[in-house]
Amino acid sequence: LIYISMGTVNNDMTTFYKNCIDALGSSDYQVVISVGNQVDIKLLEGYAASSNSKAEFCILPYVDQIAVLQKADVFLTHCGMNSVSEALYFKVPLVMYPQTNEQKGVAFRVDELGAGLYLTDETVMGIQTAFHEVIQNEMYQKHAGEISDSFARCGGCKKAVEKIVEVFA
């Protein structure tokens, strides 16, 4: 399963979504695209249907991201901190396409840690190449798993509360 979401704010990206459909159409993957409410879903569904693709596209305004990430093989994301943290928690490697400076910082760090690939070419070929690299190179999955394991070692909410109390005591 490939999951694509550009977040809830800056997601009016019809041309980019069409490029993703073209890039992934020859794959055997199920592709879930969460586009928000600014994009004409019927237009994208029609575009996907007319492309004679092998991939199965599911285009929705919003999805239960946690549920989708538990099944995803790769996540193309805008690199919001929550989205990236959730993906890495579930050991999902990333194709990263940040839109803001904060998101670029998150993408830079994930790239540095080897758990994702920074998408610099938003053309059909660029998107296709990025997905191929992340899917074929097991390093991304391995590093996403290592980050997930480090999250587990942090101790969760209970440990966070203990630390806060310790600092302010």
Q: Predicted regions: what is each one?
A:
Residues 20, 31, 68, 76, ...:
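Hydrophobic, well-ordered secondary-structure elements that form the walls
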Residues 126-169:
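C-terminal amphipathic helix plus adjacent low-complexity
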Residues 15-16, 106, 156:
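Residues at alpha-helix caps and immediate loop-helix transition turns in enzyme cores, especially N-
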Residues 1-74:
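Donor-nucleotide binding loops and adjacent catalytic segments primarily
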